[in-house]
């Protein structure tokens, strides 16, 4: 039990740190899970999804005032209503593909080799886009054009491949379609809410009968750790990318992916 608590804390930290950075939380959790020899254990696979609720609540707590204002104005304020529609438009492509092909993606693509290659390729793309002279025209994540929300949602579908990164795909797409770095990152936070809530509800419902009291305790620990870590990371991340961009995270992806491939080639 103590070792399970230790693993829950480590995985909670990994989830909280990586969920909103463009480095792929799923990819990092798969690699850390391999280090802990979690293998095909169905509980730990579900654990990785369930502790995302902590990260979701971190976003809700940080942006509570803004989201509450949007919710209250949804029926009276055209701008608020338009943003809600935009988030739904961005969410739907991934929701539809996940419903149709989610089980096949997990079966065939959830392995460390795919993660490492995706980390490297995604890192190279992020580095390239970060260094482009894009002359951004969109500076408010709640006021993008509706077609732009849809394009970002389509790009997010690529993140179903482990190692691509949900936030990374949406940030790159947002920047290519005219968003500045801060608003691109901020919209990736907002888009995470329906995407991650959907994954959480689906996984919890599917595995509700298999959860023991010990399992719930472990999940609760991971949840609290991921919440605290995510709050710290999100508050730091926006200021950092506004000043320095995404180069650090791009190189992090390339280095982790390369080291992972070396370890896999050595049979680790």
From Swiss-Prot:
It catalyses: di-trans,octa-cis-undecaprenyl diphosphate + H2O = di-trans,octa-cis-undecaprenyl phosphate + phosphate + H(+). Its EC number is 3.6.1.27. The lineage of its organism: Bacteria, Pseudomonadati, Pseudomonadota, Alphaproteobacteria, Hyphomicrobiales. PANTHER family: UNDECAPRENYL-DIPHOSPHATASE (PTHR30622:SF3). It is an enzyme of class 3 (hydrolase). GO terms for cellular component: plasma membrane. Catalyzes the dephosphorylation of undecaprenyl diphosphate (UPP). Confers resistance to bacitracin. Its main location: membrane. It comes from Rhodopseudomonas palustris (strain BisB5). This is Undecaprenyl-diphosphatase. Keywords: Antibiotic resistance, Cell inner membrane, Cell membrane, Cell shape, Cell wall biogenesis/degradation, Hydrolase, Membrane, Peptidoglycan synthesis, Transmembrane, Transmembrane helix. GO terms for biological process: cell wall organization; peptidoglycan biosynthetic process; regulation of cell shape; response to antibiotic. The gene is uppP. Belongs to the UppP family.
């Amino acid at each position: 039990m103590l070792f399970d608590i230790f693993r829950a804390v480590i995985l909670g930290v990994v989830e909280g740190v990586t969920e909103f950075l463009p480095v792929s939380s799923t990819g990092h959790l798969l690699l850390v899970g391999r280090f802990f020899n979690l293998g095909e254990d169905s509980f730990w696979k579900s654990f990785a999804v369930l502790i995302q609720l902590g990260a979701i609540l971190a976003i809700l707590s940080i942006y509570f005032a803004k989201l509450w204002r949007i919710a209250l104005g949804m029926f009276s304020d055209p701008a608020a209503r338009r943003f809600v529609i935009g988030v739904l438009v961005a969410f739907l492509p991934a929701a539809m593909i996940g419903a149709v092909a989610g089980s096949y993606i997990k079966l065939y693509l959830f392995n460390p080799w795919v993660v490492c290659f995706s980390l490297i390729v995604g890192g190279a793309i992020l580095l390239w886009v970060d260094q482009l002279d894009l002359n951004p025209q969109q500076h408010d994540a709640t006021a993008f054009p509706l077609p732009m929300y849809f394009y970002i949602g389509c790009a997010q579908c690529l993140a179903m491949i482990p190692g691509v990164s949900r936030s990374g795909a949406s940030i790159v797409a947002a920047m290519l379609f005219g968003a500045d770095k801060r608003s691109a990152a901020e919209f990736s936070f907002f888009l995470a809410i329906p995407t991650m809530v959907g994954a959480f509800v689906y996984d919890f419902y599917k595995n509700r009968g298999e959860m023991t009291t010990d399992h719930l305790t472990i999940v609760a620990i991971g949840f609290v750790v991921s919440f605290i870590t995510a709050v710290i990371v999100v508050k730091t991340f926006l200021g950092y990318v506004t000043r320095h961009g995404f180069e650090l995270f791009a190189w992090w992806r390339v280095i982790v992916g390369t080291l992972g491939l070396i370890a896999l080639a050595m049979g680790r």
